[in-house]
Amino acid sequence: MNRSDTLDLSLNLMRRPSVTPEDHDCQAVMAERLAKAGFQIENMRFDDVDNLWARRGTQQPVFCFAGHTDVVPTGNLDNWNSDPFAPEVRDGILYGRGAADMKTALAAMVVASERFVEKHPNHKGSIAFLITSDEEGPSINGTVKVIETLEARHEKMTWCLVGEPSSTHQLGDIIKNGRRGSLNAVLTIKGKQGHVAYPHLARNPIHLASAAIHELCETVWDQGNEYFPATSFQISNIHAGTGATNVVPGTMAVTFNFRYSTEVTAEQLKERVVEVLQRHGLDYDIVWTHSGLPFLTPVGELVNAATHAIKTVTGVDTQLSTSGGTSDGRFIAPTGAQVLELGVLNASIHQINEHVNVADLEPLAEIYEKILEQLLA
């Protein structure tokens, strides 16, 4: 097996058990490499979260690589074929937590930047890195706090490439040029607890709310558009009752989520839900939490640079997509930056025996380098 710079750095990062919000010196490893390439290093720690802001250059335009060093928990170690934090290459496949999501992309970003700077020491504009250890967790003290800090000092990005694993069947076949918004709610329906044999003395919140819940499930919220699928409503949890078979519950809690397109706003969705609940005469409380606005980067400089780089390196004609969950791109896009996500295959992310093709690592670094060349050389 031929070793590569990208593989070696990937292994170094993957050996560090950086389960969110831990960083385990992953950012220090990256920062050391970047400092040698002329980057100014700034560590931003908020509560228990480590963040790295590194920048080479002081001028516009600014190209930023963004990503996260934290990983999700491993689950039952007995189910892994090898230690998730002792990465192994078997038959050309790199196994370990963070292989796909997203330590190999971090390594590729660093290597691409080193190579680009060596060839173009006087490149135009600036190259930056925004790296957090709070992407897989609550995302409270990570990218969003760094962005707030940068905004306060009027430090802007022009383009941002998030190294999330975007590919589906082969490297570069999909890049995410946007994401849907995410709106969560915990709805509590109030009834009156009682004995099941005396229903006239109780008010069953399950029965009371069933028609309204059915209506919410059947509602067409919008038709989507050329960039986004239609808004989806999904119930994730329902809880009611004491566990006893002879007690009518006093309350029922329903947790649900909207993944919404740019055709509606979070406020419009809230209003429509409240209208349904009130029309059905329910006594309720509802608590909303907003995880992120939808964002879209239309075809332009960044998308064109990425699609051309992918075609040059892999021969693949990439497709643009806004599917999938949220990413930290949702915190960066509102600054006005063009944002897209481009990384390795995502089939094994968050799973037992997470893995990535070793053969994809150097091409990913090449793609990142060619994007830099088109925008900053």
Swiss-Prot record:
SUPFAM superfamilies according to UniProt? Bacterial exopeptidase dimerisation domain, Zn-dependent exopeptidases
Q: What does the record give as the reaction this protein catalyses? A: N-succinyl-(2S,6S)-2,6-diaminopimelate + H2O = (2S,6S)-2,6-diaminopimelate + succinate
Q: How is the cofactor bound?
A: Binds 2 Zn(2+) or Co(2+) ions per subunit.
Query: What EC number(s) is this enzyme filed under?
Result: 3.5.1.18
Q: In which pathway does it act?
A: Amino-acid biosynthesis; L-lysine biosynthesis via DAP pathway; LL-2,6-diaminopimelate from (S)-tetrahydrodipicolinate (succinylase route): step 3/3
Q: Which cofactor does it need?
A: Zn(2+); Co(2+)
What are the BP-aspect GO terms? diaminopimelate biosynthetic process; L-arginine biosynthetic process; lysine biosynthetic process via diaminopimelate
- Highest taxon of the lineage: Bacteria
GO MF entries: acetylornithine deacetylase activity; cobalt ion binding; succinyl-diaminopimelate desuccinylase activity; zinc ion binding
InterPro entries per the UniProt record, alphabetical: Bact_exopeptidase_dim_dom, DapE_proteobac, Peptidase_M20, Peptidase_M20_dimer, Peptidase_M20A
The residues the record assigns to binding Zn(2+) 1 are H68, D101, E164
Active-site residues from the entry: D70, E135 (proton acceptor)
Annotated Zn(2+) 2 binding lies at: D101, E136, H350
Query: PANTHER family under this entry?
Result: ACETYLORNITHINE DEACETYLASE, N-ACETYL-L-CITRULLINE DEACETYLASE
Q: State what this protein does.
A: Catalyzes the hydrolysis of N-succinyl-L,L-diaminopimelic acid (SDAP), forming succinate and LL-2,6-diaminopimelate (DAP), an intermediate involved in the bacterial biosynthesis of lysine and meso-diaminopimelic acid, an essential component of bacterial cell walls.
Kindly state the subunit structure of this protein: Homodimer.
The protein in question is named Succinyl-diaminopimelate desuccinylase
Its organism's taxonomic lineage begins at: Bacteria, Pseudomonadati, Pseudomonadota, Gammaproteobacteria, Moraxellales
